Amino acid sequence: MNRGRGGFRGGRGGRTGPSQFQQGPPDTVLEMGAFMQSCEGDIVCRSINVKIPYFNAPIYLENKTQVGKVDEILGPVNEVFFTIKPSEGVQADSFKDGDKFYIGPDKLLPLERFLPKPKEFGTKPKKKSAGGAGRGGFGGRGGARGGRGGFGGRGGSRGGFGDRGGRGGSRGGFGGRGGSRGGFGDRGGFGGRGGSRGGFGDRGGRGGGFRGGRF
């Protein structure tokens, strides 16, 4: 399984932010998400923060008790959802609708990081090629099916939040992990994890997950 470190081509996991070593809870925590439901032992949340969390970022209660880590990021960029892999001893179904979860401020990325850059208009001066240089190379056009500014797909078989969301999520959205976990979305909703996690949505299937990779 290709777990690249640069550019959203992984699944879950990846770097957790500036520091790789956790030394207890941070001095301050910010609201990150609100509980929606449990799903196969994971906690499904709606983001209430304008920024995007790192994969594997620790998630806390308001009293800074750690309850788990960010597992997946799903949905279009204007309506982000994420799942939490609970810590040992934490039961996903012990929470109720609306319960809030928190994150350290150093584990967040600005949304602009995932948005497409505006096109530049006007003619650009032609660059002179270096002597002996050929016309091509192996450069691509950037990206790898990850959608415009979102997370693409990891494939797999754990299902996906989304209707037609598959193969890399929507333009500017976050995929899931392939498959048919159900789905909250419509055309570019949430990708999935394969399998059949039951359903939040319509056609669920074929959702791609995180083909944009990791942080």
Curated annotation (Swiss-Prot):
InterPro entries, A to Z: Gar1/Naf1_Cbf5-bd_sf (IPR038664), H/ACA_rnp_Gar1/Naf1 (IPR007504), Transl_B-barrel_sf (IPR009000)
Compositional bias segments (type: Gly residues): 1-16, 131-215
Ranges for region Disordered: 1-26, 117-215
GO cellular component: box H/ACA snoRNP complex
Pfam families xrefs: Gar1
Keyword rRNA processing part of the UniProt annotation: yes
Keywords tagged on the record: Nucleus, Repeat, Ribonucleoprotein, Ribosome biogenesis, RNA-binding, rRNA processing
Protein role: Non-catalytic component of the H/ACA small nucleolar ribonucleoprotein (H/ACA snoRNP), which catalyzes pseudouridylation of rRNA and is required for ribosome biogenesis. This involves the isomerization of uridine such that the ribose is subsequently attached to C5, instead of the normal N1. Pseudouridine ('psi') residues may serve to stabilize the conformation of rRNAs. The H/ACA snoRNP complex also mediates pseudouridylation of other types of RNAs. The H/ACA snoRNP complex mediates pseudouridylation at position 93 in U2 snRNA.
Sequence similarity: Belongs to the GAR1 family.
Cellular localisation: Nucleus, Nucleolus
Protease is among the record's keywords: no
Protein's name according to its UniProt entry: H/ACA ribonucleoprotein complex subunit GAR1
A GO MF term: box H/ACA snoRNA binding
Species, as recorded: Debaryomyces hansenii (strain ATCC 36239 / CBS 767 / BCRC 21394 / JCM 1990 / NBRC 0083 / IGC 2968)
SUPFAM superfamilies (UniProt xref): Translation proteins
Organism phylogeny: Eukaryota, Fungi, Dikarya, Ascomycota, Saccharomycotina
Matching PANTHER family: H_ACA RIBONUCLEOPROTEIN COMPLEX SUBUNIT 1, NUCLEOLAR PROTEIN FAMILY A MEMBER 1 SNORNP PROTEIN GAR1
Region span, RGG-box 2: 135-213
Main localization (coarse): nucleus
Subunit-structure text: Component of the small nucleolar ribonucleoprotein particles containing H/ACA-type snoRNAs (H/ACA snoRNPs).
One annotated GO biological process: snoRNA guided rRNA pseudouridine synthesis
Region forming the signal peptide: none
Annotated spans, RGG-box 1: 5-17
